[in-house]
Amino acid sequence: GSEKEADMGPLVTRAHRDRIAGLIDSGEAAGAKVVIDGRTVEARGAADGFWLGPTLFDNVTPDMEIYTEEIFGPVLSVVRVSSYAEGVELINANAYGNGTAVFTNDGGAARRFEKDVQVGMIGVNVPVPVPVAYYSFGGWKRSLFGDTHAHGTEGVHFFTRGKVVTTRWIDPANRPTDGLQLGFPRNV
């Protein structure tokens, strides 16, 4: 956190940190390869913070808890598949639909991936597909909390109360002589 070169701060609560650390333990126990282990990170001068460094798993399988649970922490899992179709099927079969990423040099394959997967955020050659704030942030399926996304036009609409004002101003020089007219304007 507080250092200029830091990319990430502490987690919000001890319970959340402990939950994520438990999921990392679970992934390791289930046989996933821990490539980078964030459980050993310490913050100088902030030992009481809820720190957990980035963790990268390889060889994750769909039956592992680190795949079936939505972690919401600094953990990435590499799940290997043997074909494009198998990868899309794996993504679409997941109960969550927050985000996914593909790495490719083939623009056509990237466009096909964008259309084929059922998730709310897609990264192409980007590991964590979190858009800037004026775009929608949020997933599909069980990854969506409530009925709107946090940012973008849906977020603006959620935090804004719309108002419609309908007015009609009559030119005093053209005021009707037969009384007040409350109906729709007519072209005469």
Where are these regions (language model features)?
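Short N-terminal helix-initiation segments at or just after the protein's N-terminus
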Residues: 1-2, 17
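Short linear capping/connector segments at secondary-structure termini
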Residues: 2-9
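Conserved C-terminal structural/oligomerization subdomain of aldehyde/semialdehyde dehydrogenase
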Residues: 8, 24, 29, 44-188
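Short beta-strand to alpha-helix junction loop
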Residues: 10-21
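Short secondary-structure junctions
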Residues: 31-40
